[in-house]
């Protein structure tokens, strides 16, 4: 398979022969769903927690007398059926959200996503991506000719200038090829990959 290569001005500068195993794979929706779901689940810190009725700071005083009020009897205000009381079955930090996906499936998922990006014309290959200084306006000026509103940029090596100049843009993300993940590839409208990063992705996933 052959992909067109452009420069940051949006002009064609040649083409690049790429692996069909990575960029020409058939789309498998079930596989993509499983890989993305597992990636997001494994990224969870698992630190959510609520208090039980024993852990809530409440007085153990009886809220009202046992008989004569017409209300159901009550012993304390920390019970789960009262406002401000503890949870009956609370979540605890030791909960494990890990989902196992073997390497073969994960590799196939990445290849499926990249192939679909090519078919949807959401993948752009550029010859190089660099900025002279760590300023946001430098990065915006470099990529503005390509007309990108929301994009993921993948480079073979993330320089300090490139990182610092792009980190303040909410709709742009610059990562190295080794950091590419299924969620980020699907999250952005466009994915811009440098020529060297394509080769690195092929070595890693093809």
Curated annotation (Swiss-Prot):
One of its GO terms (cellular component) is ribosome. One of its GO terms (biological process) is translation. Residues 51-96 are annotated as: Disordered. GO terms for molecular function: rRNA binding; structural constituent of ribosome. Keywords: Ribonucleoprotein, Ribosomal protein, RNA-binding, rRNA-binding. InterPro entries: Ribosomal_uL4 (IPR002136), Ribosomal_uL4-like (IPR013005), Ribosomal_uL4_dom_sf (IPR023574). It comes from the Bacteria. The keyword RNA-binding applies. Pfam families: Ribosomal_L4 (PF00573). Belongs to the universal ribosomal protein uL4 family. PANTHER family: 50S RIBOSOMAL PROTEIN L4, LARGE RIBOSOMAL SUBUNIT PROTEIN UL4M. One of the primary rRNA binding proteins, this protein initially binds near the 5'-end of the 23S rRNA. It is important during the early stages of 50S assembly. It makes multiple contacts with different domains of the 23S rRNA in the assembled 50S subunit and ribosome. Forms part of the polypeptide exit tunnel. Part of the 50S ribosomal subunit. This is Large ribosomal subunit protein uL4. It comes from Chromobacterium violaceum (strain ATCC 12472 / DSM 30191 / JCM 1249 / CCUG 213 / NBRC 12614 / NCIMB 9131 / NCTC 9757 / MK). The lineage of its organism: Bacteria, Pseudomonadati, Pseudomonadota, Betaproteobacteria, Neisseriales. The gene is rplD.
């Amino acid at each position: 398979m052959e992909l067109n290569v452009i420069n940051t001005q949006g002009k064609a500068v040649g083409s690049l022969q790429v692996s069909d195993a990575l960029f020409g794979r058939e789309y498998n929706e079930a596989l993509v769903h499983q890989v993305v779901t597992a990636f997001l689940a494994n990224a969870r810190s698992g630190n959510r927690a609520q208090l039980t009725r024993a852990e809530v700071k409440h007085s153990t005083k009886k809220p009202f007398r046992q008989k004569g009020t017409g209300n159901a009897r009550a012993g304390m205000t920390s019970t789960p059926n009262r406002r401000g009381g503890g949870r009956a079955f609370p979540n605890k930090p030791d909960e494990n959200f890990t989902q196992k996906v073997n390497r073969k499936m994960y590799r196939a998922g990445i290849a499926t996503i990249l192939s679909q990006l090519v078919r949807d014309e959401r993948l752009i290959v550029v010859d190089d991506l660099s900025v002279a200084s760590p300023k946001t306006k430098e990065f915006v000026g470099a990529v503005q000719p390509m007309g990108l509103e929301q994009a993921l940029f993948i480079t073979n090596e993330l320089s300090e200038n490139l990182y610092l100049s792009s980190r303040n843009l909410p709709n742009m993300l610059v990562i190295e090829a080794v950091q590419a993940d299924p969620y980020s590839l699907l999250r952005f409208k466009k994915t811009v990959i440098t020529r060297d990063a394509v080769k690195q992705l092929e070595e890693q996933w093809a």
